[in-house]
A protein has these predicted regions:
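Post-signal peptide N-terminal segment of mature Sec-exported envelope proteins
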Residues: 29-62
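Bacterial N-terminal signal peptides that target proteins for export
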Residues: 1-9
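Acidic/histidine-rich catalytic neighborhood of metal-dependent amide-processing enzymes
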Residues: 148-250, 264-267, 271-272
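Bacterial signal peptide processing site
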Residues: 23-26
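Active-site-adjacent substrate-binding region
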Residues: 47, 55-58, 83, 106-108, ...
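A non-catalytic alpha/beta surface segment that caps or lines the substrate-entry region
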Residues: 66-126
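Acidic/histidine-rich, surface-exposed loop or edge segments in extracytoplasmic proteins
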Residues: 47-53, 64-77, 144, 182, ...
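C-terminal motif of bacterial Sec signal peptides marking the signal peptidase cleavage site
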Residues: 17-21
Length: 335
């Protein structure tokens, strides 16, 4: 993913979002073009939200953190790497007995052709529609020959989804179907561009648009870099404002609101963008201030010791509460 720049809420209200480039780390690649946001948070209409009901959702953060450590233990997992295949098998081993779609294809990249494997676990609900929760699981390709293991960037969110899967196993959901997506090849293999990035999720969005699945998706929730012990999820102008408002309401009901949307970032280039472009309500749940000035991002310092089970608890419980709120909102705001 790429962050373009920080903006204060006041500037967001008064200024148009600008096209810029990011040169955070030349060795780890990245420059990107911002997708303009159609509305700012202050323009989001007042939502009619259902009342709070029931105990907080179950989420085992200790187990989720163990998953995180197990993913990291495989080592670097860029596309085409033997460790990458081991992580694929690891994820699938946790989904035995579930309805799993394996979306496998070959990506043509600036560094050659690579196999790409999106894993989709489908949990059926009683309502017509789908809520998608996604995370990428690959690590940065340009850093493939270093000790970079992407503990926060890729492993934290992948572990989060495994624990969410535990909460959904063998349950008939009283609401929308929930699809969990571990998408592949999010990272650029050379330098971040529209063509060299988001390979897996772009393929999945195109496929679902072609087969009609896209029309059934009520919300697309992306988790990325959510394990930082100093957790602060930022508001993203490229995300759907009303959906971010629902996430904030979910966090507030659980007492976690201080960890959400205190700051606003410049538009994020991340796995939600192919769905944003297709009109699907989407939100990027991301903490892109990983160390001072994001110093640990895309470096070998992205390690488990900087992360916390509590952060996984905060995000995991908030995502499950978000699903519960969305299930009871009738109708959802228009796309």
């Amino acid at each position: 993913m790429i962050k373009i720049f920080f903006l204060s809420p006041i500037l967001l209200f008064s200024l148009a979002v600008t096209l810029v480039s990011c040169d955070h780390d030349k060795d780890s690649s990245q420059a990107a073009v911002q997708v303009p946001a159609s509305t700012t948070p202050s323009e989001s209409p007042k939502l009619s939200l259902p009342p709070d009901s029931g105990p907080p959702p179950e989420f085992d953060s200790t187990r989720a953190f163990q998953y995180l450590k197990e993913v990291v233990a495989f080592g670097p997992r860029p596309v085409g790497n033997a460790n990458h295949k081991k992580v694929e098998d690891y994820l699938l081993s946790h989904l035995k007995g579930d309805d799993v779609e394996n979306d496998i294809f070959t990506a043509d990249t600036p560094e050659g052709k690579f196999p790409v494997h999106n894993i989709v676990a489908k949990f059926p609900g009683t309502k017509d529609g789908i809520i998608v929760i996604a995370s990428h699981y690959d690590t940065n390709y340009p850093l493939r020959n270093t000790s970079y293991v992407g503990a926060n960037d890729g492993a934290s969110s992948s572990a989060l989804l495994l624990e969410i899967a535990n909460q959904l196993h063998a349950k008939k959901l009283d609401g929308y179907s929930v699809w969990l997506v571990w998408d592949d090849a999010e990272e650029a293999v050379k330098s971040w561009t529209d063509a060299d990035s988001l390979y897996g999720i772009r393929h999945l969005a195109e496929k679902w648009e072609a087969d009609g699945t896209l029309k059934k998706i009520k919300a697309f929730l992306l988790a990325d870099m959510i394990g930082d012990a100093d957790l602060s999820i930022e508001r993203d102008p490229n995300s759907t404002p009303w959906l971010e408002d629902v996430i904030y309401e979910a966090a507030t009901r659980l007492g976690y609101q201080s960890h959400f949307f205190v700051h606003t970032v410049g538009g994020m280039e991340d796995d939600h963008i192919p769905f944003v472009k297709r009109g699907v309500p989407s939100a990027d749940i991301i903490d892109f201030e990983y160390g001072y000035n994001n110093v640990f991002w895309h470096t070998p310092q992205d390690t488990v010791d900087k992360l916390s089970p509590k952060s996984l608890q905060i995000v995991g419980s908030t995502m499950l509460e978000t699903i519960r709120i969305l299930d009871k909102m009738d109708p959802l705001p228009p796309k």
